[in-house]
């Protein structure tokens, strides 16, 4: 595995070679349905592997074409809520590790929200936009009888054509007339972008460089990132990498934005850690009326509930309730004529030093103070304790240091309290559950989690294995 020092040097070289984004216009010319079926895990939905064919007319007078894979999941039988989500598929694996497998793409919007999208009637598409991936695997999957990852095969002329590919995905959801099946998706009214880590860096680049001037996207859910933009250039093999961002918009003249950040994202994005970017402290945008940022305590960049890595100590904090609520709030903020703003931003307590390193204030358990406090960390509400931690959650995992594995490093750790400490904290299950209820009720009432997740958190607390071993209610 490559060391952080080598990655910092490589990143610096890539940033030095980066080109300014090119203003382009694109057109979808056709859509091919490669496979279509009823979704196994989404009742009333069709899952389709498709290929999107498009042309690009660039500002420099040149023209190009792209042929990229996508996964489209759409509701049947009038179940649609007329909102689409474009998942900016994450291919960071191929920028950090040798391409020993095709299965290094991650549809993090699905991983982070579970069945929520399909319970609520959203239309979903994830699309490949990273030229580095299509250059590795080529235009089409081999016909060899083996399983292949549809999302890695395609062709992109220029790396910066990515922006129009991503805009075209939104356009396709709003106008699916080129879809060749008469039972295809219905048009949506509102389209949200959703990116996680690498995808989130691309979203920040789109906003910082004004690459969606006509607001094809109606809103952006930007997850697990610091101030680091994913750049596009035509230098192989990466065709761009994380780099410094231009100033983010501050005046609200952009589609609404919700940013989700974790303890990891406050500290890993720095030249001395991952080798690029700045802390998520610098993506805070408190004067912009169209920007919210929620910083989630006790959560790592890659927690086990979203992406289990098979580690003995990976951070077990579950941020998915916050992700689902953020998506619901962004929908209400952007859909229809009667729109509702999301809850206020929630920041960690702390500051940055002279080197732009975030220095957090921590609680008695070592979790970052402030922010959105799910029941797995402690808080105080109206002078009473809320939340019931079962151990210490950290943002970084030392197992990822030698040899350096960035995925492991940013997965964080969890160390459970001893039985003696748990009994001292919660002499009875009733006391434990009351504290979870207090935290969950507070978060739900203020819109930071949904009511469905409030009930699920309470139900889980009632059956959490505790040293006193009281029976789980039926």
Regions found by a protein language model. Give the residues of each.
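C-terminal His-loop and adjacent cap/lid subdomain of alpha/beta-hydrolase
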Residues: 26-474
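Intrinsically disordered, low-complexity proline-rich regions
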Residues: 1, 25-26
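Bacterial N-terminal signal peptides that target proteins for export
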Residues: 1-11
């Amino acid at each position: 595995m490559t060391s952080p020092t080598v990655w910092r040097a490589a990143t610096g070289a890539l940033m030095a070679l980066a080109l300014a984004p090119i203003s382009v216009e694109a057109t979808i010319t056709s859509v091919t349905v490669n496979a279509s079926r009823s979704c196994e895990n989404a009742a009333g939905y069709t899952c389709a592997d498709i290929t999107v064919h498009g042309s690009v007319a660039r500002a420099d007078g040149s023209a190009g074409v792209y042929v990229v894979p996508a996964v489209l999941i759409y509701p049947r039988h009038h179940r649609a809520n007329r909102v689409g989500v474009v998942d900016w598929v994450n291919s960071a694996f191929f920028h950090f590790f040798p391409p020993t497998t095709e299965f290094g793409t991650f549809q993090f919007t699905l991983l982070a929200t579970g069945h929520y999208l399909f319970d609520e009637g959203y239309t979903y598409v994830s699309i490949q936009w990273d030229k580095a991936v299509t250059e590795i695997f080529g235009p089409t999957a081999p016909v060899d009888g083996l399983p292949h990852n549809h999302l890695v095969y395609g062709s992109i002329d220029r790396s910066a054509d990515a922006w129009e590919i991503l805009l075209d995905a939104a356009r396709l959801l709003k106008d699916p007339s080129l879809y060749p099946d008469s039972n295809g998706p219905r048009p949506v009214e509102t389209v949200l972008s959703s990116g996680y880590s690498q995808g989130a860096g691309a979203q920040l680049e789109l906003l910082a460089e004004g690459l969606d001037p006509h607001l094809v996207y109606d809103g952006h859910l930007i997850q697990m990132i610091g101030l680091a933009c994913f750049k596009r250039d035509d230098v192989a093999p990466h065709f761009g990498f994380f780099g410094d961002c231009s100033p983010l918009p501050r005046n609200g003249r952009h589609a609404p934005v919700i940013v989700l950040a974790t303890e990891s994202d406050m500290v890993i994005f720095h030249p001395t850690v991952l080798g690029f970017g700045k802390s998520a402290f610098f993506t805070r945008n408190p004067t912009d009326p169209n920007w919210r940022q929620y910083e989630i305590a006790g959560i790592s960049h890659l927690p086990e509930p979203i992406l289990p890595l098979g580690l003995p100590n990976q951070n077990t904090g579950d941020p998915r309730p916050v992700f689902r609520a953020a998506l619901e709030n962004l929908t209400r903020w952007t859909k229809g004529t009667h729109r509702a703003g999301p809850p206020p931003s929630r920041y960690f307590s702390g500051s940055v030093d002279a080197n732009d390193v975030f220095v957090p204030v921590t609680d008695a358990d070592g979790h970052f103070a402030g922010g959105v406090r799910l029941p797995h960390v402690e808080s105080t509400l109206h002078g009473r304790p809320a939340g019931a931690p079962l151990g210490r959650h950290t943002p970084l995992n030392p197992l990822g240091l030698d040899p350096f594995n960035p995925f492991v490093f940013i997965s964080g750790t969890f160390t459970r309290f001893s039985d003696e400490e748990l009994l001292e904290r919660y002499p009875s299950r009733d006391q434990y559950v009351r504290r979870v209820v207090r935290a969950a009720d507070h978060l739900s009432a203020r819109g930071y989690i949904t009511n469905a997740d409030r009930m699920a958190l309470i139900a889980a607390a009632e059956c959490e294995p505790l040293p006193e071993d009281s029976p789980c209610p039926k």
